């Protein structure tokens, strides 16, 4: 081979290498080159490493936290590179972890804590499946310096049956939940105005603080493909407690949609009925009955051009107060917009949205277990929530989201501690200043939110978010029990193939409530500031094999004696030791 020929071949390889480098920097047609390789080709495959992308950002609804979906995009590269025939080297494939359909978990801890879960699912045939989940969490209590019992139980059973056909799918769900809680929030100085200590002890012993909640539901969902009718969901819920309270709720939510000239037109319909009763009010004089039927339609039109997506919609609701014949009509803006400033790397979004929220006794009990069965139930008129934000990617595996908003809500519900009056004829276990009522007011909220998520590698992920709120009320002196600042962070990592660990922390700022105590010798009415609190939780797990995993969890590891609600201290350091087993039938 002559020197000239060698130079030509070297220049040819150099040109091809430079072309490949620049092709990585720009999204351009790289052209083609024919390369004749005379050396036998011995390919090797490096260890696979999946880059964890941040969530897709071309969503139409920027105000809600959507389910994160990771997508892998394949980019075709024009090439006529044809290596000479050779024998590929052997590749050591990583062992793929087997996936199981079912699992069982059992854990025990201090404070007499028991945590158990059982999840099973099975395909009956190609189109049908059934599933169920049983969950239990309980504690025998034991918080220091309490005057009343603080144990709790929470057990639920959920069942589902589904059927998937070519053009549509549907499923039905049913479930039952049983919960036991205690109104243990008595101040340590309760009834200290009684002259005889035995009288004080007898009064405390006469209080039965236990409350029981029961919930039964039946629901279903159907969705269709290639049809104007998109989907519909419905649910019936019956909720009751140990004091004769009863609540029924039924709703149906169909959705239709079609396209005109490539633009999507959708309409969501809703019929939401709520009816219930309490045997008596807080002072034991009269029964409380309530009922509301809300009917709404939410049409929307989606406009897209280049990097701009606009969803123009409105919400029209008619609310009927079935007990007081007080019917109202509401109109809400439902407008969202996104603009991709730099592709998926930086997206600006904004919106103005409102809706009519149906409040219920069950919803309040799940937010605050210690409410009294004497509540005033009414819907909330969420007039508008105007917001602007920016989200995107700082790097391929780091995403961010910042948002500012101004919200106006008429009839926003807040919790307030109930007063104690020794002349109250109602002597139920919640009538000693150890329960909470619900108040409503027009509340305007200015909010700032920031979030950062990162997957540093396939073994380490981190997230942090914070929210600052400023409240303005019309009639209430304060936005009771609403914190101005909340911060949360989490870190998860795989130590080895067998060991994994994680930690989460959260901070909740100060809140305000009212303490009211009235007796013959004692009359107190004061605004109480609940201290901010910081909570640290950690867990460590060991994967014995594909099926069996052991774990240990620790909650409130800083052992802060904080109060989530007035006079309701939480458990101190909590440790849970358990195991999880995965299986198939």
Name every feature range the model reports, one short phrase each.
Residues 1-27, 346, 491, 573, ...:
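Bacterial Sec-dependent N-terminal signal peptides
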Residues 122-144, 266-270, 290-321, 455-470, ...:
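Surface-exposed extracellular loop regions of Gram-negative outer-membrane beta-barrel proteins
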Residues 22-94:
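N-terminal periplasmic/intermembrane-space "pro-region" immediately following the signal or transit peptide
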Residues 139-152, 173-249:
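Flexible loop and strand-edge segments within Gram-negative outer membrane beta-barrel domains
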Residues 99, 107, 309-313, 317-585:
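Exposed, low-structure sequence patches enriched in small/polar residues
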Residues 84-86, 95-104, 108-145, 149-155:
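Outer-membrane beta-barrel translocator/receptor signature
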Residues 118-122, 132, 157-163, 218-224, ...:
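Residues on the lipid-exposed face of transmembrane beta-strands in outer-membrane beta-barrel proteins
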């Amino acid at each position: 081979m002559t020197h000239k020929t060698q130079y030509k071949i070297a220049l040819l390889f150099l040109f091809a290498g430079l072309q490949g480098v620049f092709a990585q920097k720009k999204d351009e047609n790289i052209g083609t080159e024919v390369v004749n390789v005379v050396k036998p080709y011995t390919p090797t495959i490096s260890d696979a490493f999946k880059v964890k992308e941040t969530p897709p950002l071309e969503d139409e609804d920027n105000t809600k936290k959507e389910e994160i979906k990771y997508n892998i995009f394949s980019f075709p590269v024009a090439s006529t590179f044809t290596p000479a025939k050779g024998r590929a080297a052997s590749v050591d494939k990583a062992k793929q972890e087997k996936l199981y359909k079912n699992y069982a978990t059992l854990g025990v801890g201090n404070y007499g804590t028991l945590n158990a879960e059982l999840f099973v699912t099975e395909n009956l045939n190609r189109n049908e499946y059934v599933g169920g989940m049983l969950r239990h969490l309980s504690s025998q209590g034991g918080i220091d310096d309490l005057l009343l019992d603080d144990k709790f139980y929470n057990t639920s059973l959920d069942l589902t049956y589904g059927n998937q056909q070519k053009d549509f799918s549907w499923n039905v769900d049913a479930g039952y939940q049983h919960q036991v809680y205690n109104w243990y929030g008595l101040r340590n100085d309760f009834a200290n105005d009684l002259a005889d200590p035995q009288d004080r002890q007898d009064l405390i012993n006469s209080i039965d603080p236990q409350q029981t909640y029961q919930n039964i539901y039946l629901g279903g969902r159907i969705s269709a493909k290639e049809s104007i009718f998109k989907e519909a969901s419905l649910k019936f819920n019956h909720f009751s407690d140990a004091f004769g309270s009863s609540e029924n709720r039924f709703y149906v939510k169909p959705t239709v949609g079609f396209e005109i000239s490539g633009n999507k037109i959708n309409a969501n319909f809703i019929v939401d009925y709520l009816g219930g009763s309490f045997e008596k009010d807080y002072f034991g004089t009269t029964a409380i009955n309530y009922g509301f039927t809300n009917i709404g339609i939410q049409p929307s039109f989606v406009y897209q051009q280049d990097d701009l997506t606009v969803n123009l919609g409105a919400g029209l609701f008619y609310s009927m107060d079935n007990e007081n014949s007080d019917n109202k009509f509401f109109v809400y803006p439902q407008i969202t917009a996104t603009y991709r400033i730099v592709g998926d790397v930086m997206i600006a979004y904004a919106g103005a949205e409102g809706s009519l929220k149906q409040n219920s006794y069950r919803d309040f009990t799940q937010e605050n277990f210690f409410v009294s069965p004497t509540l005033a139930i009414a819907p909330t008129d969420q007039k508008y929530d105007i917001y602007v934000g920016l989200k995107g990617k700082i790097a391929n595996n780091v995403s961010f989201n910042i948002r500012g908003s101004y919200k106006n809500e008429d009839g926003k519900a807040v919790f307030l501690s109930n007063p104690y009056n020794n002349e109250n004829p109602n002597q139920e276990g919640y009538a000693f200043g150890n329960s909470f009522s619900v108040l409503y007011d027009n509340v305007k909220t200015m909010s700032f939110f920031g979030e950062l998520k990162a997957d540093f590698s396939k073994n380490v992920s981190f997230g942090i978010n914070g929210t600052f709120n400023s409240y303005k009320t019309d009639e209430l002196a304060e936005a009771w029990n609403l914190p101005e600042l909340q911060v949360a962070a989490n870190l998860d990592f795989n130590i080895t193939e067998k060991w994994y660990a994680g930690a989460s922390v959260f901070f909740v700022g100060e809140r305000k409530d009212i303490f009211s105590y009235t007796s013959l010798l004692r009359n107190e009415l004061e605004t109480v500031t609940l201290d901010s609190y910081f909570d640290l939780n950690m867990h460590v797990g060991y994967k014995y094999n594909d099926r069996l995993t052991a774990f240990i969890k620790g909650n409130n590891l800083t052992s802060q004696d904080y109060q989530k609600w007035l006079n309701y201290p939480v458990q101190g350091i909590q440790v849970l030791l358990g195991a999880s087993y995965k299986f198939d039938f």
